[in-house]
Structures are given as structure tokens and as C-alpha cells.
Amino acid sequence: MSWDYKVSERALKQLKKLDKQAAAQILAYLDERIAGTHDPRQWGKQLKGELNNIWRYRSGDYRILCQLQGEVFVVLVLEVGHRKNMHQ
């Protein structure tokens, strides 16, 4: 079974605030690495502690925070932003 991704309204607003090139880079990353993959965990890192249900992905200088929804094979994009401002 392959995975797909959905972008939350919050993440969509954050994408719109970025310059067009950065937003395109992030969406291209999601299309190339996440959409159609059999295991999105291979591309990211799981956060620790209370946030261990969140995965982070890095696309250039940007981080993408996601929640894996295994029962429907969807990666829900929660937040995007420059990595200096995102959770480690």
C-alpha cells in the first residue's frame, strides 16, 4: 500500500507566507519522497517525548512537521517553516 499526503489549513497558510520558490521546493519534496512511498518513515525522524506522534522532514533549509495516519495511509502535513524556527 502506498502513502499520500494532505496539507492542513495551518500548513497551507504557512506555505503561502513563504516565497514561491521555497513553497515549490517543499511541495516538490512531498511529491517526490512522500507521495507513493511504501514507508514515509525512511525519509524523516520521529520527534521525542510528548510529540512522538509527529515526524519531521527536511527540505533544504525548511522543516516539514507531519503526523502519519496509518489506518488511511496519509501523511498529514501540520506545519512548515524555516528550520531555525521549527521544533528539533
Predicted features along the sequence, with ranges:
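A short, surface-exposed loop/turn module that caps and links secondary-structure elements
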Residues: 32-56
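Enriched for short, Lys/Arg-rich terminal
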Residues: 2-24, 28, 59-63, 67-88
